[in-house]
UniProtKB/Swiss-Prot annotation:
Its EC number is 2.7.4.9. GO terms for cellular component: cytosol. PANTHER family: THYMIDYLATE KINASE, UMP-CMP KINASE 2, MITOCHONDRIAL. This is Thymidylate kinase.
Length: 212
């Protein structure tokens, strides 16, 4: 008798640039490994050869794209990512942790660019067919603090070089998403010390682990 493989868990990390996702992603990787969780790690846009090419286009400061073209590119990359990486991992029982997912599109293209949420939702329904993360960790930080952290660290990409108002709209859109899906999105105050933030991360990971 063959036993059915239990579907893996899907975790996403979100936040404005400079919120510290990369630091916490490394912590999550180590924590899951210590607890015997078979997990794969990926990112958006990206995660597949085709999606990485789209990522390069989206982040290149020289790219000129209409609002709708930008949103469509994000979802084109996402569809390939889901088909090639996300769904196979989850179906095989692996946990999948992604640095950004659809909440980023609502935040950057919806909040930042002004693409209507309803238009993004229609693309989400078409591309994802009901797929949603089991847990989203939203690292929230005032935009001024985030800008200070980012200053001088590297050459800014197409989104990072946007004006302060753009990033304030992105943050507001993220918080709106959290209000709309409180059962999935955990808002973490990223202005605190790393140890305090990671203590909260552990609480959410433990709850997810207990759910099996």
């Amino acid at each position: 008798m063959s036993s059915e493989v239990r579907r893996g868990r899907f975790i996403t990390l979100e936040g404005i640039d400079g919120a510290g996702k990369s630091t916490h992603l490394s912590f999550i990787r180590d924590w899951l490994a210590r607890h015997g969780v078979d997990a794969a790690f990926t990112r958006e846009p990206g995660g597949t050869p085709l999606s990485e090419k789209i990522r390069d286009l989206l982040l290149d400061p020289g790219t000129v794209a209409s609002l709708d073209a930008e949103a469509l590119l994000a979802f084109a990359a996402r569809q390939q990512h889901i088909a090639e990486v996300i769904e196979p991992a989850l179906a095989a029982g692996r946990w999948l942790v992604s640095d950004r997912f659809t909440d980023s599109t609502y935040a950057f293209q919806g909040g930042g660019r002004g693409v209507p949420f309803e238009r993004i939702r229609a693309l989400e329904d078409w591309v994802q067919r009901g797929l949603q993360p089991d847990l989203t960790l939203l690292f929230d930080l005032p935009t001024e603090v985030a800008a200070g952290r980012m200053a001088g660290t590297r050459v800014p990409d197409r989104f990072e070089q946007e004006a302060a108002d753009f990033h304030r709209r992105v943050r507001a859109a993220y918080l709106r998403r959290a209000e709309e899906a409180p059962q999935r999105i955990a808002v973490l105050d990223a202005s605190r010390g790393i140890a305090d933030i990671q203590a909260d991360i552990v609480l959410h990971l433990e709850r997810l682990l207990e759910r099996g």
